[in-house]
Amino acid sequence: MNYVQYYPTDIVNGEGTRCTLFVSGCTHACRGCYNKKSWSFCAGLPFDEKMEAQILQDLKDTRIKRQGLTLTGGDPLHPRNLAVLLPFVKRVKHECPDKDLWVWTGYTLAELKADTLQRQILPYIDVLIDGKFEQDKADPSLVWRGSANQIIYRFTQY
């Protein structure tokens, strides 16, 4: 798995101060996508042990308290990314149980639940924003969403 960007301190992609990882690879190809550079699975850098350790270190940093981790992209829940992300998310939740996990995906919750691989990550997600970006439903006034078809699911209240 590759990633195109990592923000160790982010206040845009979720509530509170967070770490945000932009994962490479997306097959949805939404018209009007703001992050087309993340569509290729080869874009960016390999997500390696060093980057994994850096994110965990940042989440544990007491000088800059982070509320949690955001995974976006690209599409972090594309099956090609889950072989790496699922063990990483489990590790984050084990080592940082007080941190929340926000995930943006082009898949709907129903699609994720129907897929045997994708549904395995759902128990670790606190907030899921689902659905492809639909340019004809775009609304800049929406919080955390680009288009009105996207739904915010809060699986846990932290």
Curated annotation (Swiss-Prot):
Gene that encodes the chain: nrdG
Disulfide bonds: none
InterPro entries documented for this protein: Aldolase_TIM (IPR013785), NrdG (IPR012837), Organic_radical-activating (IPR034457), Radical_activat_CS (IPR001989)
Documented EC number(s): 1.97.1.-
Cofactor note (record): Binds 1 [4Fe-4S] cluster. The cluster is coordinated with 3 cysteines and an exchangeable S-adenosyl-L-methionine.
Residues that, per the record, bind [4Fe-4S] cluster: 26, 30, 33
Function: Activation of anaerobic ribonucleoside-triphosphate reductase under anaerobic conditions by generation of an organic free radical, using S-adenosylmethionine and reduced flavodoxin as cosubstrates to produce 5'-deoxy-adenosine.
Location (main, coarse): cytoplasm
Subunit structure: Forms a tetramer composed of two NrdD and two NrdG subunits.
Requisite cofactors: [4Fe-4S] cluster
Origin species: Pasteurella multocida (strain Pm70)
Gene3D superfamilies xrefs: Aldolase class I (3.20.20.70)
Keyword list, A-Z: 4Fe-4S, Cytoplasm, Iron, Iron-sulfur, Metal-binding, Oxidoreductase, S-adenosyl-L-methionine
Protein's name in the database: Anaerobic ribonucleoside-triphosphate reductase-activating protein
Family to which the UniProt record says this protein belongs: Belongs to the organic radical-activating enzymes family.
Catalytic activity: glycyl-[protein] + reduced [flavodoxin] + S-adenosyl-L-methionine = glycin-2-yl radical-[protein] + semiquinone [flavodoxin] + 5'-deoxyadenosine + L-methionine + H(+)
GO molecular function, one term: 4 iron, 4 sulfur cluster binding
Residue sites binding S-adenosyl-L-methionine per the record: 32-34, 74
Statement: the UniProt record of this protein carries the keyword S-adenosyl-L-methionine: yes
Localization in the cell: Cytoplasm
